[in-house]
Amino acid sequence: LLANKKVAEFIGKQKKTFVYRIHDEPNEDKLINLQTVISKFGYAINMKSKQDISKSLNKLLNDVNGKKEQNLVDTLTIRSMSKAKYSTENIGHYGLAFDYYSHFTSPIRRYPDVMAHRLLQYYIDGGKSVDADTYEEKCAHSSDMEGLAAQAERDSVKYMQVKYMQDHKDQEFLGVISGVTEWGIYVEIIENKCEGMVRIREIKDDYYTFDDKQYALVGQVSKNIIQLG
């Protein structure tokens, strides 16, 4: 982190074109939606300032660790955050609370790091600021490719999970309820992290309705409660 920070700061203060790793503030509407959900579990977000939001989110993730609602809160918190990307326009890195940040330390596996190395050497040798538009195009392409790589990774994991479960159709697994909605529940198998949905109509022992205050399904006759965890 220190190397990434200092290289970006060294060039940034010279006002020369550089490849930054930037991270914008969380989306306000998504934060409000997150606040609505977590309030049902007794949590809150202080949205008075950027610093307060950052501290609140970190505290929230620490507080839910190991709790039955952790999976839901973790997912919603991540979704409320902006995605980090590459750009020549430095706005800082919100998640790390850095005014200057770059990806510099892994040129063996990331092209933006290669660009950062080349620009650093070029400027140390006395070079003038390079064309910002040219490098902004490279940054946009790098961000797009990063997104595709992340999606490919998620898809490959899902594919292998489906392939595994096809060979274990009649086997019983221990799972936890990772999500509750008005149309059903999500169950994650503890052993292998595979997740699937059980629709309300497939739960035959009662007629269940969604209780948004408890974030649970409640049986109309038995009053049985199906909730996170």
Write out the residue ranges for each language-model feature:
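Hydrophobic alpha-helix position signal
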Residues: 11, 36-38
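Structured C-terminal cores of nucleic-acid metabolism proteins
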Residues: 6, 24, 29, 39-229
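Nucleic-acid-binding small beta-barrel platforms of the OB/S1 family
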Residues: 31-33
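Glycine-rich phosphate/pyrophosphate-binding loops
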Residues: 7-21
